[in-house]
Amino acid sequence: MMATRKSSGPERRSNARLARPRVLVTAAASSLGRVLCRRLHRSYDVLAIDTRPFSDRPKDVEHAEVDLRRKAAQTLVKKRRPSLVVHLGPWHDERPARAAATLETTATLLQLVEETGAQKLVVLSAASLYGPSPTSASFLTEDAPLLGGQRSRAVADAIAVDMMVQSFFWKAPATETVILRPVHVVGPHLQNLASRFLRQRRVPTLLGFDPMMQLVHQDDVVDAVALALEPGRRGVFNIVGPTQAPLSRILEARHAQTVPLPGFLLGPALVRARALRLTRLDDSELVHLKYSCLVDGGRAGAELGFVARRTLQQTLLDAG
């Protein structure tokens, strides 16, 4: 009778590591992508794809510095065959991109997910895509139309990606597909529009307007992604912070000096500043300083078990 050898401690750890599921993360070298990879590598083998360098990644994260649309990237994905995929949509990529490139990258990824038989696809979209409006409902659910692209080409591109993934629900029912739409994400490591806006010492505002705002901490968003990766989760989910507050109160808590300006002055000033590359804020985004876009996060709480753990005060302190 052949004796069985009991695995040693290091061998058991090695076997457990080999058994870990592999997750592909796109736009992994963006500021939010870096935070996400540092969280996911504790539980998954992470394959990070981004054309930007990612030199400070965890040692066990595999990084391919290549465009996902290139054959080399597609060959790598087919070889590694990740069972889980996290796609940071254009709203979180932080690079200005042409609409064609944004849509082509997403279409390529969806094809790879289908070809490799990935079990799970999580796409990070944005609640901003609903669009601020003086006539919108107080708290929009996931069934509300995405109307934010009427004033901004960048938002329109992000909506196109969101809609493309929604159609994938029906095209590939074997893949558990999740779309997360977080409110404005802020954090100490982020270089997105909301975080940079809150870091200003002097903040321009629209005279006569004080919209309600919803913020969520970067770590809470990462928690939501981790929950969405669990088996059996699929659908569209708004991701919200613990509460909402007027813009004036948020800026006061940040000790920022507000500079109220009428719209006919602030709009042209932003156009000139953008032309001189002094800001990335587009005049079409002034609507966020005028009207509210509040969303309901009840579905994420009920179906994902998501609850934001960082208070609004902590979120503002951690904005950097």
Regions found by a protein language model. Give the residues of each.
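Conserved Rossmann-fold NAD(P)-dependent oxidoreductase catalytic core, especially the SDR/UDP-sugar
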Residues: 107-154
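Conserved glycine-rich Rossmann-like NAD(P)H-binding loop of the short-chain dehydrogenase/reductase
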Residues: 45-55
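Active-site Tyr-X1-5-Lys
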Residues: 150-178
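NAD(P)-dependent short-chain dehydrogenase/reductase
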Residues: 168-214, 218
